[in-house]
Amino acid sequence: MTINYHKEIMTSHPWTFFLLLFKWKGSIWKAVYMETIIFLICYGIISVIYKTAMGESSQRTFESLVRYFDKRLSYIPLEFVLGFFVTTVVNRWTKLYQTIGFIDNVGLMANCYIRGATEKARIYRRNIMRYCELVQILVFRDMSMRTRRRFPTMETVVAAGFMNKHELELYNSYDTKYNSKLGTKYWIPANWALCMTYKARKDGYIESDYFKAQMEGEIRTWRTNIEWVCNYDWVPLPLMYPQLVCLAVNLYFLVSIIARQLVIEKHKMVDEVDVYFPVMTFLQFIFYMGWLKVIDVMLNPFGEDDDDFETNALIDRNITMGLMIADNPMSTPELRKDPFYDEVDVPLLYSEESSNIPNHHYHGSVSEVRLEQKGNAPVMMMPHSQSAANLRRMMSFKSVDEDEKDINAFSMSHDDARMRNWREVSLDSSFLADLNENKEWKIPTNPQKF
């Protein structure tokens, strides 16, 4: 099941996330407790053997081995491997959730475009919804063990009401060597839904070809999303990738069982404390092994972990919602004036409890900035100093030869004479083309000087 904890994190109090640590279902503690116990037992056994069962020479050899592994433990790039893989898995999980399939749009389109309160119009709408949901059921049966247990055979799909017996017979008639073994019959209910749309148009329940095309497009989008879910299950991430991550994490802590042993050399002055419990190594194990468990859970969200997708609940929700929409065609309220129809200023009401909570209305970050002006002088508008209109005005005073390079002699002074009549400056459509073709003009490289 999906563990929802949003209610507990509505505010950002210091203890908000701390309280989440005490949850068990779907928690990191439930995911890593077995591995942690095994790790600590192995660590403790080696520590006891080192301190009680080894001779002095064996202890010196073991201490050398500890120092050797401890200095080279960083050779395993654990943070890089885990971080990159988690990013890939989270992106994949997000894509699966976005395409898992919510049938509301198909139902709303069917309700809007297949019009009529007759029994046949209702049958058209309900069958289209049922066929679309049947596509999802067929895919989930082959991907999710929860759905497979719910519908172990196609006969159970009929018994649950998602198919009729004659539809199952037609469905089974498509069995070929290719279809039956490779499970490629997901397209059949989608084809039925599209054919129903065509028949509804032919019988006049859909008023125009445009409405029919819109309805077909929504069914096609639904089928495409379900296909993406199927494709992600069919083609997982390359096996060597999760193998590499799993191998890196487990070998890291296998080496840590020796590398993190606390050794105290009697002939040296050391300030180490002989602790029986490896506190920092324990914390590191929780973090890194928990990171690996996050990957394990999110890599296949159609499994049976606590936080995997609720496929059966989604099927129930879709068929209930879809048929409810299909049974209420054009069910709009009577057209009346709204409560604020005669109000100039709409009274915005709140409950007594929320009326004193301040609202921070939307506005731009610099919308309240007031720029200073010199006295009451109006703001003068002019073209940019590097614009083509400015360039034309500068060059209208005098032409220069091809080889003349000093154009500063024709610059304008920065007084009122330069600012006059900017609004009269115009740029005809052929100016730029003439400027490129007329070799008598010399384009200044720094027009901002003028």
From Swiss-Prot:
Its main location: membrane. It catalyses: chloride(in) = chloride(out). Forms oligomers. GO terms for cellular component: chloride channel complex; membrane microdomain; plasma membrane; presynapse. Coiled coil: none annotated. Belongs to the anion channel-forming bestrophin (TC 1.A.46) family. Calcium-sensitive chloride channel subfamily. GO terms for molecular function: bicarbonate channel activity; chloride channel activity; intracellularly calcium-gated chloride channel activity; ligand-gated channel activity; metal ion binding. Disulfide bonds: none annotated. It is found in: Cell membrane. InterPro entries: Bestrophin (IPR000615), Bestrophin-like (IPR021134). Ca(2+) binds at residues 300, 305, 308. It is a multi-pass membrane protein. The chain crosses the membrane at residues 32-51, 61-82, 243-260, 279-292. Ligand-gated anion channel that allows the movement of chloride monoatomic anions across cell membranes when activated by Calcium (Ca2+). It comes from Caenorhabditis elegans. This is Bestrophin homolog 1. Keywords: Calcium, Cell membrane, Chloride, Chloride channel, Ion channel, Ion transport, Membrane, Metal-binding, Transmembrane, Transmembrane helix, Transport. The gene is best-1. Residues 1-31, 83-242, 293-450 are cytoplasmic. GO terms for biological process: gamma-aminobutyric acid secretion, neurotransmission; glutamate secretion; protein complex oligomerization; regulation of synaptic plasticity.
